Amino acid sequence: ILYTIGWLVTLPSYLLKQKRRGGFGTGLMERFGLYRVSYNREPKGVLYVHAVSVGEVVIALKFLRAWLWERGGSAVLATSTATGHATAMNAQVPGVRVIYSPFDLLGLPGRCFDRFEPEAIVLVEAELWPNFARAAKVRGIPMAMINARMSARSESRYRAFKWLSKYYFSFLDTMGV
């Protein structure tokens, strides 16, 4: 609850900062779980890959090319930054729908998951968003974290809030470093 309140309090300043940086383009609505493409035209039963910025997107694209070549199907690649989104769009990987990640506010990740009905979620980062993770768990969507690295600074934070870290990491089904 405190996390969500914090999100709501900081959201206006975040939106203002993004506007100064060039805005969201068409991505702002996607951050609220609203999409231009008709629901019936969206891929279902996808592999949902969450990559925040350019570095994670590059790794995600390599992962997705290998995954889709081996297994087929389709995927959703969700990014959080305009540069990460542009990198993913420019790659034009067949079978991959690129979206902006929903804000981690109650209801928004779930709305996104209900739209794409992911069979699994792969996080390409060492960050776990609480409402996102909870929405996946409630829907029974397995979640994995790949490319997980932890700096000394992050480690000290996780240790300081060990009880909270244990809770958040309990949402993961597997982790790859």
Feature names for model-found ranges:
Residues 1-8:
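N-terminal, charge-rich interaction modules
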